[in-house]
Curated annotation (Swiss-Prot):
SUPFAM superfamilies with a match to the protein in the record: Chelatase (SSF53800)
PROSITE patterns: FERROCHELATASE
GO CC aspect terms: cytoplasm
Residues engaged in binding Fe cation: H202, E284
Statement: the UniProt record of this protein carries the keyword Thylakoid: no
EC assignment: 4.98.1.1
Organism annotation: Francisella tularensis subsp. tularensis (strain WY96-3418)
Any single GO BP term: heme biosynthetic process
Function noted in UniProt: Catalyzes the ferrous insertion into protoporphyrin IX.
Name of the protein: Ferrochelatase
């Protein structure tokens, strides 16, 4: 990131993504998962019982199990996870586009932490920080916990910066247009028209939705608005919605991505999958969808499977974020 002197406008924008292990070894993965799965916003359970289950069962098993999956998707050239690599590049590009703002990034779990970046921005003279969680759809498990951590950090500061937040952008016109265009461009590259475009969002325990989390509604609205943008141009394509990455025995939001793909496979359909809830490619897209779900789909009789990459550090993503920020805070040109 660029370093700014006091002559610059003392405003900053902090992009925040979910997080990643520092490396794909067991120790790094275990440390990351412990922080992530210890968040009561993520796992709503009896804290004493959950701590025992997490430390004695889940962490020892999942840390070892995930070494191979993280190694498979790891950007070995830069020795970074894809999520970290793309988020860092995205912030750097947006920083160059916004002359009067310091733009940086942080991870909710792992490194670089929200605390370290808020302190870094203060050291550069920022007295106002705009928090931009890179989650289009709001959930207490994602967006809310970002602000929990921001205000935890602020509670320890004697001189607090002014904090503003960018709203979830699940139905923002710039987001819908960008996702729609992304699908169009991908379809043009294919040799034949697919039977279905499947919108796969990260799942959530259904009880969270029942308690008032609006995540499902936000996902459905993103899906509906993009579908409305495309269905007239592609009348022979079915647009469907599903939820992936189920964890644990509880019922999660349905339909499940695995189940939908198996249904399509039995009908010998060709499928294009997009994961518009992820701002950057990560384990859930590069391994779960691109490898595991694809292999299962083909094995079950599916015809063709194609995954649309996330927006990542593309110029379209940079422009979209710029327009959303400008719309919300009226950027000073």
């Amino acid at each position: 990131m660029q370093q700014y002197s006091s002559k610059y406008n003392k405003q900053a924008i902090l992009l925040v993504n979910l997080g990643t292990p520092d490396n794909y070894d067991t120790k790094s993965i275990k440390r990351y998962l412990k922080e992530f799965l210890s968040d009561p916003r993520v796992i709503e359970a009896n804290p004493v019982l959950w701590k025992i289950i997490l430390n004695l069962i889940i962490l020892p098993i999942r840390a070892k199990k995930n070494v191979h999956t993280y190694k498979t998707v790891w950007n070995k050239q830069h020795n970074k996870s894809p999520l970290l690599f793309y988020t860092e590049n995205l912030a750097d590009k947006l920083d160059k586009k916004l002359d009067n703002y310091i733009v940086d990034y942080a991870m909710r779990y792992g490194n670089p932490s929200i605390e370290s970046k808020i302190k870094s921005l203060q050291d550069q003279g920022a007295t106002e920080i705009i928090i931009f969680p890179l989650y289009p759809q709001y959930s207490a498990t994602t967006t809310a916990t970002v602000y929990d951590e921001v205000y935890r950090v602020l509670s320890k500061l004697r001189w607090q910066p002014t904090i503003k937040g960018i709203n979830p952008y699940y139905d923002n016109k710039f987001h819908i247009q960008t996702i729609s265009q992304q699908i169009k461009e991908h379809l043009k590259k294919l040799d034949s028209t697919p039977d279905t475009v499947l919108f796969s969002f990260h799942g959530l325990p259904k009880e969270y939705f029942d308690k008032g989390d609006p995540y499902y509604c936000h996902c459905y609205k993103t899906y509906r608005l993009v579908k409305e943008e495309l269905q007239n141009e592609y009348p022979n394509i079915d647009f469907e919605l599903s939820f992936q990455s189920r964890f644990g025995p509880k019922k999660w939001l349905e339909p499940y991505t695995t189940v939908k793909l198996e249904e399509f496979a039995k009908q010998n359909k060709s499928v294009v999958v997009i994961a518009p809830g992820f701002s950057a490619d990560c384990l859930e897209t590069l391994e779960e969808l691109a490898i595991s779900e694809k292999e299962n789909f083909i094995k079950k009789g599916g015809k063709e499977f194609s995954l649309i990459p996330c927006l990542n550090d593309s110029n379209q993503h940079v422009d979209m974020l710029y327009n959303i920020i400008d719309e919300e805070i009226c950027l000073k040109k």
